[in-house]
Amino acid sequence: MKKNFLLIVCLHFLMTLAAQQADKYILLKPDRVFDGVQMQTGWVVLVKNNTIEQAGAMTFKLPAGTQIIELKGQTLLPGLIEGHSHLFLHPYNETSWDDQVLKESRAERTARAVNHAKATLLAGFTTVRDLGTEGAMYDDAGLKKAIEKGVIPGPRMIIATRAIVARGAYGPKSENPDVDLPQGAEEVAGLEELSKAIRSQIGHGADLIKVYADYRYGPNGESQPTFSEIEMGWLVGNTVSSGRKAVAHASTPEGMKRAINAGVSSIEHGDDGTEEVFKLMKEKGVALCPTLAAGEAVEQYRGWKKGIDPEPSRIVNKRKTFQLALQAGVTICMGGDAGVYAHGDNAREMELMVDYGMKPLEVLRAATAVNADVFGYANKIGRIKKGLAADIIAVEGDPLADIKNIRHIKLVIKDGTIYKK
């Protein structure tokens, strides 16, 4: 009996020792830590496997075998979160949107998306909210799975799959009425088709549902609302009942109001929002993802020489409406519509947010804790906090002193794995 007891004790000790030896610890020692809310000094961060084990002053004992990474002159931050991305698109000055949808095979588009995912991760963005494959069907679900399995490097993906548009509202447009072209999103007409599209996209892996609440649908190509209030309410109700969030592409005041009143979690773009609309967003707790970088990129593709030519009316108007949103106290997400411009250049949006009137501290919050909160992932990412996922980056210098320092990536850790050092 005594021998059996000793054997059990020895086995338990050996198993515990083996488990401890299997654990991987990394201690990060930067000059400062942005925890997702505030900049902290005198902090270190201990990572255990894929989780943040400790964050704060060095008051704890290091486990044996801990890897220590000195980050002198550097700032540690939560992995950045891109709030509006299209990994299956590439810059429109390389290939037009129509030609990407119509002429590039899905195999080519997926191959490009693999490269885009890696570039995004190495730029310090460890999570992306990818808001539609733009004609590549459900291939974002496969890309997401390949990243999760470790087949390819890339960020965590929050995916919308195909997105939903009103029949006849989107593109590409056919010049021959007898020819139906492939579309950049799933077309629907009426409540029954709405329900079918929502459930189909969820069944294929959608983490959220994206709807185009307005588009260039008017008789002269101007933006107009594309769904009625009843249809918008139906879409959001069906989405929310599945435990998911609905988000809306919207730029017109009426399209924005219909989406806000229906209960979407965020408005994407919001170019022509008014003081009234932004007050409604604040009241309803709806966030704005402004996509400043996409607008600037498109104007530059059209010939605008930034810093030399006067700002086009689109940019002047965007500055004005962004200020209205800030003054109304609307929650601002960080999302630039990457894909319109190069993946890996995601920090461009953060720089423009400062240029358009936000403080660097608010921009850092938007790209970390705020995005995590709005997207429903605050229990996992967006902060440097004990128990959260070890998605951590380090940049040279202090991004509060100069937001451009966010580009100087020195370290990228996602889920405890070092991808750049």
Please state what every model-predicted region is.
Residues 88-109, 167-182, 218-228, 284-315:
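Active-site gating loops and adjacent loop-to-helix segments of metal-dependent hydrolytic enzymes
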Residues 114-138, 154-163, 206-217, 245, ...:
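Divalent metal-dependent hydrolysis catalytic cores, especially in the metallo-beta-lactamase
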Residues 23, 37-77:
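Histidine-rich, glycine-flanked metal-binding segment
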Residues 91-93, 140, 169, 220, ...:
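Histidine/acidic-residue-rich catalytic or RNA/ligand-binding cores of hydrolases
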Residues 74-145, 149, 167, 230, ...:
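Metal-associated gating/positioning segment near the N- to mid-region
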Residues 193-288, 312-331:
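Histidine/acidic residue-rich metal-binding segments in metalloenzymes
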Residues 4-16:
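Bacterial N-terminal signal peptides
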Residues 99-101, 241, 314-399:
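His/Asp/Glu-enriched, well-ordered alpha-helical/loop segment
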